[in-house]
Amino acid sequence: MNTGTYLMPTAAYIHIPFCRQRCFYCDFPIAVTGFQSLTLDGWVGEYVEAVCREIAGQQHQGQPLQTVFFGGGTPSLLPITGLEKILLAVDQYLGIAPDAEISIEIDPGTFDQVQLQGYKNLGINRFSLGVQAFQDNLLALCGRHHRRRDIDQALTAIAKENIENWSLDLITGLPEQTAADWHSSLTLALAAGPKHISCYDLVLEPQTVFDKWEQRGKLAVPPPERSADFYRHGQEVLTQAGFHHYEISNYGRPGHQCRHNQIYWRNLPYYGLGMGATSYIDGKRFGRPRTRNGYYQWLESWLNQGCPIPGERVSPLENLLESLMLGLRLTAGVTWAQLPSVNQTEKAKILATLTSFGDRRWLEFYGEDNQMLAPNQTTTETVQRFCFTDPEGILYSNQILSALFAALEEDF
């Protein structure tokens, strides 16, 4: 790998694809295991070894990683010895900073207190619990394998193990989900005591079970206006409870924002490792095949070629658009300094487009000393930062971003 002088990644996402079954909304690259306990014998161990070989091929020459994230799939299905092997490889070849955030996704019904203790012994210090909903009927409709009793057992294990830094995931806009269901899930989530809560709006991904049902008219998802009300209610309940709404879907207690995901939102480089994972290195985004056999073939070819960084560099315009799209997910918004090589013409186009929405109160602009600017004060010289209003601007963010992208792309 030719490391050159580009900025090396300080984060690594590691994909653990194993799942007991595929949820009806899921289009992630997974490997369905059924309900048997996994061991490192056979294909599970083969996958772990493949990921370790990919890690060894990175030839990292930068600073130790600041964040490591085990996502999936269901990482809590992988035996702890498998996680240990991967973490040892990460530390050996990429380095892990002493104060690194090391996260793992865990699902109810796939771990106990002993397992949590094992994770802590490995240095894992942040846990993301995939609850999604507290109502058994909604969980069943989504094809989730767990139920409310599994959630309660998971929360008990977390409490007994004195896990302090953990997050709880919820989904809004589920089939047959009512306002009462959503309020109950928020209330129960707060009572569980996480330091971080993620609220994701359901997206009907192509070729998923939900997508096929929707095309046949068999899926009763809430209409967009009700989903918007769910979003407003979640924002109100969680912020009133003391959570900081720092990203479109994410809320954290002070000091508990997810450090790893902020790498993505700031459009900074990162390693993606394992089946279906995507990397952003040296200005290049590239993914791996989404099946195990495809990934293994790709890995052998990549190793035989000397571990190059594949793909073409993102163009300056693409980089600018990605930085805007990702950065504006953060409620703090974007500063000019965070936009790569933005010129005066582009600044003027960005401001002209954004201020055209100003009378709808969907955006805010800030100058020096973080002072909010009135609409007639917004110039390329006075504006230092801009963001969506919360929650209304966020709800219309797709419309605003579409107009922004059209304005910036018209000369290309």
Swiss-Prot record:
Its main location: cytoplasm. S-adenosyl-L-methionine 2 binds at G73, T74, Q132, R144, D169. InterPro entries: Coproporphyrinogen-III_oxidase, Elp3/MiaA/NifB-like_rSAM, HemW-like, rSAM, rSAM_horseshoe. [2Fe-2S] cluster binds at C19, C23, C26. The keyword Iron-sulfur applies. S-adenosyl-L-methionine 1 binds at Y13, G72, E105. Keywords: 2Fe-2S, Chaperone, Cytoplasm, Heme, Iron, Iron-sulfur, Metal-binding, S-adenosyl-L-methionine. GO terms for biological process: porphyrin-containing compound biosynthetic process. One of its GO terms (molecular function) is 2 iron, 2 sulfur cluster binding. Its cofactor is [4Fe-4S] cluster. Disruption phenotype: Cells lacking this gene have no detectable phenotype. It is found in: Cytoplasm. GO terms for cellular component: cytoplasm. Induction: Induced under microoxic conditions. Residues 4-241 form the Radical SAM core domain. Probably acts as a heme chaperone, transferring heme to an unknown acceptor. Binds one molecule of heme per monomer, possibly covalently. Binds 1 [2Fe-2S] cluster. Although this protein has sequence motifs typically found in proteins binding the [4Fe-4S]-AdoMet radical-SAM cluster and S-adenosylmethionine, spectroscopic evidence suggests that a [2Fe-2S] cluster is present; S-adenosylmethionine was not detected. Has no detectable coproporphyrinogen-III oxidase activity. PANTHER family: COPROPORPHYRINIGEN III OXIDASE, RADICAL S-ADENOSYL METHIONINE DOMAIN-CONTAINING PROTEIN 1, MITOCHONDRIAL. Might carry two S-adenosyl-L-methionine binding sites with only one binding to the iron-sulfur cluster. Belongs to the anaerobic coproporphyrinogen-III oxidase family. HemW subfamily. This is Heme chaperone HemW. It comes from Synechocystis sp. (strain ATCC 27184 / PCC 6803 / Kazusa). The gene is hemW.
